[in-house]
Amino acid sequence: MLIAFCTCEIFHLTMTDQVKVRFFTNEEDDLKVSENPIFVPVSLKRYGLSEIVNHLLNDGETKKAIPFDFLVDGVLLRTSLQDYLTKQGLSTETVIDLQYTRAVLPPSFLASFTNEDWISSIDTINPGHGAVLASNMKLQESKILSGSYDGVVRTYNMSGEVESQYIGHSGPVKSVRWISPTRIVSAGNDHSLRLWKTKLAGVEEGAEDGKTTAILEGHKGPVVDLAVDYKSNKIISAGNDSVVGVWSTNASDMSAVTVSEPTGSTMSKKRKKLALQDSTIKRRAPLAMMDGHGQPVTGVCFDVNDKSVIYSASQDHTIKTWDLVTSRCVDTRSTGFSLLSILQLPNLHLVASGSSARHINLHDPRASSSTEQVSRKLVGHTNFVVSMAACPDKDHMFASASHDGTVKVWDVRADKAMYTLGKGGKVFGVSWDPIGIVSGGEDKKIDIYREAN
């Protein structure tokens, strides 16, 4: 009877009840308040708690308020303290430790650029990007790289102007990545990768613009995703032929491939023209082709903490971990759903996978593998999750693009998406640059949402 009585008390907290909380933060010193516990109403949510912290910081003076988020045991508080206590089965005798941190405000629309066709892939580069730092070059501003269903790779400046177009693929381009401020790699439905030489304003003025320096061949189906490691000069590719390809950013590191001249009256004029242009371009074979998946590979990424390790996602429902030294699969995890994208959150030791089941799974690759080994599941999209991008300066945050026409902003410490950015039509690609979140898709537009300061 005593247990039942206590349980009844816990689940009938009133709006006038109070609970002791202890505020603490890892923010800079001038945002720290006393860690002595104080009583607050259990009805408070993050906005009310933020008002209290601002009042304590300003010592009663009227100053511009700083919005804060609050974490309890590492999880973002998205309910009232009353709901938290009830869910955890705790009484108001509990002292709640509340960590506060600057809130991430909703991104605001910055710009939209029009493209000629559907945009399949987006990548960005900026002065502090790893590709720039590894190249010892200088870059004045962020640049946008896009791959399109019309077979053209384009670079844009932040004013929306097309700086260069790269024509060579004989079908839709499915993935693009910066290698350096003057070099890019693309892949597409024509089964090939292309290394390009580009020239950006203020960078290597002698560079020849728009030149394919090498065609990389080895896949037997469309190549749908790429990842680049700037320090090891490695490229990895995901193919619909169920194979993961390994390449070099330097053509001289790969073996030459001899290709006979194309023949046949059924070849279109466009293909004949492109084939003639390509006849003088060197072709290279992969460093390795890694078999193991039973269905198309849809996403690949390097392990930021160990560049000899990569991860791949596939429609065969699995995430595989590969050792590049031996070119062997060292771990396989089954998810029960077709996987369409993959992203590593290195400082959290997590790998995120987007699925055809509309959710995002978070996996810890250090944990022993077993069926449905999932650390967390993020639910919110209503269609395929096909692309993801990590926040450049916040370890816990990333963005996801979906065929439901939205880009969602996530914090892995919360159960739901932080914000939803709408687009017209399916979204195929997303990148997160310091200037903002850049996405493209079926509406033939590149949209930029700026992060609020």
Curated annotation (Swiss-Prot):
CDD domains: WD40 (cd00200). GO terms for cellular component: nucleoplasm; PeBoW complex; preribosome, large subunit precursor. InterPro entries: G-protein_beta_WD-40_rep (IPR020472), NLE (IPR012972), WD40/YVTN_repeat-like_dom_sf (IPR015943), WD40_repeat_CS (IPR019775), WD40_repeat_dom_sf (IPR036322), WD40_rpt (IPR001680), WDR12/Ytm1 (IPR028599). One of its GO terms (biological process) is maturation of 5.8S rRNA from tricistronic rRNA transcript (SSU-rRNA, 5.8S rRNA, LSU-rRNA). Keywords: Nucleus, Repeat, Ribosome biogenesis, rRNA processing, WD repeat. PROSITE patterns: WD_REPEATS_1, WD_REPEATS_2, WD_REPEATS_REGION. PANTHER family: RIBOSOME BIOGENESIS PROTEIN WDR12, WD40 REPEAT PROTEIN 12, 37. Component of the NOP7 complex, which is required for maturation of the 25S and 5.8S ribosomal RNAs and formation of the 60S ribosome. This is Ribosome biogenesis protein YTM1. It comes from Meyerozyma guilliermondii (strain ATCC 6260 / CBS 566 / DSM 6381 / JCM 1539 / NBRC 10279 / NRRL Y-324). The lineage of its organism: Eukaryota, Fungi, Dikarya, Ascomycota, Saccharomycotina.
